[in-house]
Amino acid sequence: MNIHEYQAKEILRKYGVPTSTGLVVTKTEKINETIDKLNTEVYVVKAQIHAGGRGKAGGVKVVKSKEEAKKVAHDMFGINLVTHQTGPQGQKVNRLYIESGCDILKEYYFSIVFDRSASCITFIASTEGGVDIEAVAEKTPDKIIKFSVDPATGLQDFHMRGIAYELGFKDNQAKQMKEIVKSVYNAFIETDAAQIEINPLIVNSDGNLLALDAKITFDDNGLFRHPNITAMRDHDEEDPLETRAANAGLSYVKMDGNIGCMVNGAGLAMATMDIIKLYGASPANFLDVGGGADRERVKEALKIILSDKEVQGILVNIFGGIMRCDIIAEGIIAAAKDIGIKVPLVVRLAGTNVEKGEEILSNSGLAIIPAHDLADAANKIVEAIR
């Protein structure tokens, strides 16, 4: 789960991380009133969307008067902001964060992530802050600093000292950086975060370190422990089909293709998407119904797939282990009769009760195309939509 910048800063401040502060606006009629509450020489108006690249896309504006800030805020509120992360459709700006500006002497990058390849928490830092860190890693990888934390021992003093040293901090600034490292680590662990990113972390004119922008992504599997964080969820920033799927206990990610996929198991789902590409089409979604899906969940999964107007055909690929193939077959038939599937539907079943499942499908009287293996299924669905 993602949250907005102003929410991320609120959490970080609770853990002792110094951040820039401001006021959030959620209604156009509150813009002037909110800006009047800020007494500053420089105003920073920031669009609040769940995507990076806001600055380059015009979603962050620095102005030097109240009237100019009000005009910029009114112009920005409600627009569709297109960044390199939103896609061409953009993301509607429903919230603004208005801050007091500050002098910046130097910008840094600092983040903490769970590194799945190394099976540990990793700090990533760079003296090149305020820019796309992926570009820095590609062009000047020597400027990327990494410190891994052994899960058996946790954060140690040498991690904090090392990060401060590698970033070139000394004396009081080194002490500040060590405290920030510790605070961010504690926030990461205690909130079940998947990533905390501060970009940029700045040194201001007073020589103090300050988080000027912040992003936090949470592990969805840990949200049940944090109702206060779950309450921060902004459904307007999420795909409505993905929200609907999550409420039904389904793992669904919308994609840009034309073949809808319903599969059980994340690995099998990715293999199914790969083979669809191999045979010349593109997957419209990732959808894992899980190992314990029942008839109603299968029915809802197909409804969600068909809610995507770009879907021209559906490939169902089920390996029946915990999931019985006859249950899948009954769900497919129920959905087909209920909503009327008007696109080609290819079904490949294997595993528990496969013969019974295939018999149910063949006796249904519906135009369901059976497949014997994954390659056969991919070939048939691609041919069916041509």
From Swiss-Prot:
Function text: Succinyl-CoA synthetase functions in the citric acid cycle (TCA), coupling the hydrolysis of succinyl-CoA to the synthesis of either ATP or GTP and thus represents the only step of substrate-level phosphorylation in the TCA. The beta subunit provides nucleotide specificity of the enzyme and binds the substrate succinate, while the binding sites for coenzyme A and phosphate are found in the alpha subunit.
Organism: Rickettsia africae (strain ESF-5)
EC number: 6.2.1.5
Subunit structure: Heterotetramer of two alpha and two beta subunits.
Catalytic activity: succinate + ATP + CoA = succinyl-CoA + ADP + phosphate; GTP + succinate + CoA = succinyl-CoA + GDP + phosphate
Any Pfam family the entry gives: Ligase_CoA
Binding site for ATP: K46, G53, R54, G55, E99, C102, E107
DNA-binding listed as a keyword: no
Family of this protein: Belongs to the succinate/malate CoA ligase beta subunit family.
PROSITE patterns according to UniProt: ATP_GRASP, SUCCINYL_COA_LIG_3
Required co-factors: Mg(2+)
Pathway stated in the Swiss-Prot or TrEMBL entry: Carbohydrate metabolism; tricarboxylic acid cycle; succinate from succinyl-CoA (ligase route): step 1/1
GO biological process terms held by the UniProt record: succinyl-CoA metabolic process; tricarboxylic acid cycle
GO cellular component labels: cytosol; succinate-CoA ligase complex
InterPro entries found in the cross-reference section: ATP-grasp, ATP-grasp_succ-CoA_synth-type, ATP_grasp_subdomain_1, Succ-CoA_synthase_bsu_CS, SUCC_ACL_C, Succ_CoA_ligase-like_bsu, Succinyl-CoA_synth-like
Superkingdom in the source lineage: Bacteria
Binding site for Mg(2+): N199, D213
Cofactor mode of binding and number, as noted: Binds 1 Mg(2+) ion per subunit.
UniProt binding sites for substrate: N264, G321, I322, M323
GO MF term list: ATP binding; magnesium ion binding; succinate-CoA ligase (ADP-forming) activity; succinate-CoA ligase (GDP-forming) activity
Protein name: Succinate--CoA ligase [ADP-forming] subunit beta
Organismal lineage: Bacteria, Pseudomonadati, Pseudomonadota, Alphaproteobacteria, Rickettsiales
ATP-grasp domain mapped to chain residues: 9-244
Keyword annotations from UniProtKB, A to Z: ATP-binding, Ligase, Magnesium, Metal-binding, Nucleotide-binding, Tricarboxylic acid cycle
